[in-house]
């Protein structure tokens, strides 16, 4: 009867058991020697502290306890495939790993530096000394086209149209003169902007 009973505590595995463990591919580093009695082995789990048997705790030395130094599996990776939401855990993990995180729960996010505005091709040509043709400003170009259209409509001979176009042309001429003075004030270098000839009031037919 006594021989049929299983012995208490940890025992040394048999040769067949050792061969079976090696065949299964269990790493020998997972077996730690816990008891001062030679030949007693115990398999432990990754990341846990190996503790001696409670029956031998009094007789064993505290120096027998050894911490498993094998790499631990990430807590987030272990929950990745079982449908558990790890958003809160991941946020705490990221906040704890940042150097700008403070214990009171306030942390800062480093923003990107402001990007410099790209240098236009015109500015590059001007800085290199190349001569380029300046474009006419949009308001001035609009007034010039409007004046040309007004002149064509003026020749239609319709009295109401001619009256409205004459008033519009006078206002356009006034705007052109003001715009030229404004452009000259903003160009201290003295660059000359070529303007198309605007017909004077003397050359216009009387209404």
Swiss-Prot record:
<dbReference type="Pfam" id="PF03187">
    <property type="entry name" value="Corona_I"/>
</dbReference>
<comment type="function">
    <text>Structural protein that is not essential for the viral replication either in tissue culture or in its natural host.</text>
</comment>
<keyword id="KW-0946">Virion</keyword>
<dbReference type="InterPro" id="IPR044311">
    <property type="entry name" value="N2-like_embe-CoV"/>
</dbReference>
<comment type="similarity">
    <text>Belongs to the coronavirus I protein family.</text>
</comment>
<protein>
    <recommendedName>
        <fullName>Protein I</fullName>
    </recommendedName>
</protein>
<dbReference type="InterPro" id="IPR004876">
    <property type="entry name" value="Corona_nucI"/>
</dbReference>
<dbReference type="GO" id="GO:0044423">
    <property type="term" value="C:virion component"/>
</dbReference>
